[in-house]
Regions:
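Ankyrin-repeat and related helical/solenoid repeat scaffolds used for protein-protein interactions
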Residues: 321-385
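Short helix-capping/linker turns of helical repeat alpha-solenoids
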Residues: 39, 45, 50-53, 57, ...
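Hydrophobic face of amphipathic alpha-helices that form TPR/SEL1-like repeat modules
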Residues: 57-66, 80, 95-102, 131-138, ...
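Terminal, low-structured helical/coil segments at or just beyond the last alpha-helical repeat
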Residues: 373-374, 378-414
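Classical Sec-dependent N-terminal signal peptides that target proteins to the secretory pathway
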Residues: 1-25
Length: 414
């Protein structure tokens, strides 16, 4: 009776999912789908093969795992994947790896996940190989080993022949994330010698698959000329691709090229547009530059109120020029009433970060008693400190607003 019940279940499975009895199962568009060869089941009294049972278990498990046609049930899926794996179906090991990795249907077990991924990798499963690469790169579920990570990323990044549960072969393209990681490993000498040429090759391959991080890093190489020929046009092309996908670093760099770049590339309207996009992701540098554009009327009408708003958004120890410019706004009453207390506060913050113009104007406030008790000794201290920068007097007396030169050209997505 047990044998008959198993046969009935498998037969019902065929009916439920309306499987064709294809002459050549390898032609199926859904490569991992389970197929049953014509003539395999001849009646309820015929015992299904161990392989057929494993395939049925795998199919049931997949549908419980994804919630397709069957109720989503991780615990049931886990049990069936285990049975299929125990019966020798290697494809089940990858799912077991994922379920242990992310705690689906059971508690998270990274060591077991690693072991299951290793079994799955024997079938040239590129996703399993990629996960093994990540786990070795970051020491997840195993000891950190960059050399092993590099090997797994190399396998996963390249096209390879894989075998499904019906022993059909298929060429699988490399995993894009593995291609990006392989580029990084070559770029930063992780598990291999530094090779910018190889890094650029793999960034370009991943970028062709529309991976924004790869597009950005490729743009950086072209922009800096690191390991490749300097090519500002290709840099802009790749920044633009990444920026349109919402990568804040690309939006900022693209804006800075249009803002500060060579005259034939300057376009204040485009710069303003991309600064706004980056600012919407709370990029402080973008806020600061929007303040400058509002202050000087570049790409927009001059507006001190808007400038102050953006400087307040960007003000931080990492961008002390914002403090200086706010100091000037309150010192001279630009778009707001003169406020010596506020001016002193912001000059003091900028001076604490070594901004020489702020040091000089802090001296003025102490000398004249603006926003602070008059104190000539402290005033002279700040005047001397500003002059000690060995700058020409016009540099630190000049009341011009501070510009912040683009300083993120060496920033790569890691």
């Amino acid at each position: 009776m047990q044998l008959k019940r198993v046969s009935i279940v498998i037969s019902q499975l065929l009916c439920i999912f309306s499987f064709s009895q294809a002459v050549n199962s390898c032609e199926d568009k859904t490569f991992w789908q389970t197929w049953y060869q014509g003539g395999q089941f001849k009646g309820f009294g015929i015992s299904p093969t161990k392989e057929a049972v494993a395939k049925a278990q795998y199919l049931f498990a997949e549908n419980h795992y994804k919630g397709n046609l069957l109720t989503k049930d991780y615990k049931r899926a886990l049990d069936l994947f285990k049975k299929a794996a125990d019966a020798g179906l290697l494809q089940a090991y990858f799912r077991l790896g994922l379920m242990n990795h992310y705690g689906q249907g059971k508690s998270k077990d990274l060591k077991s996940a690693y072991t299951y991924y290793e079994h799955a990798a024997k079938t040239n499963n590129p996703e399993a190989q990629f996960n093994l690469g990540l786990m070795n790169r970051y020491g997840i579920g195993t000891k950190k080993n960059l050399y092993t990570a590099f090997d797994w990323f190399t396998k996963s990044a390249n096209s390879q022949t894989i075998l499904n549960q019906n022993k059909c072969t298929k060429i699988m393209k490399g995993v894009v994330e593995a291609q990006f990681n392989l580029a990084q490993m070559n770029h930063y000498a992780l598990g291999t010698e530094k090779n910018i040429f190889e890094a650029a090759k793999w960034y370009e391959i991943a970028a062709a698959h529309n991976m924004k991080e790869a597009q950005f890093n490729l743009a950086q190489l072209f922009f800096t000329g690191e390991g490749v020929d300097y090519d500002i046009d290709r840099a802009i092309e790749n920044y633009l691709l990444a920026a349109k996908q919402g990568l804040a670093e690309a939006q900022l760099n693209l804006a800075q090229i249009y803002h500060y770049g060579p005259s034939h590339l300057q376009n204040y309207q485009k710069a303003h547009q991309w600064y706004l996009e980056a600012a919407n992701q709370d990029v402080k540098e973008a806020y600061f530059n929007l303040g400058l554009m509002a202050q000087y009327g570049r790409g927009v009408h001059q507006n001190y109120v808007s400038a102050k708003h953006y400087y307040l958004q960007s003000a931080s120890p990492k961008i002390p020029e914002s403090y200086l410019n706010l100091g000037f706004i309150y010192h001279y009453g630009l778009g707001t009433p003169v406020n010596n207390d506020k001016a002193f506060e912001y000059f003091d913050k900028a001076a604490s970060q070594g901004i020489h113009q702020a040091e000089y104007h802090l001296g003025i406030h102490y000398r004249d008693g603006r926003g602070v008790t008059k104190n000539n000794d402290i005033a002279n201290y700040w005047f001397k400190k500003a002059k000690a920068k060995d700058l020409k007097e016009k540099d630190y007396i000049n009341d011009s607003f501070a510009f912040r030169e683009p300083d993120d050209v060496d920033l790569y997505v890691k």
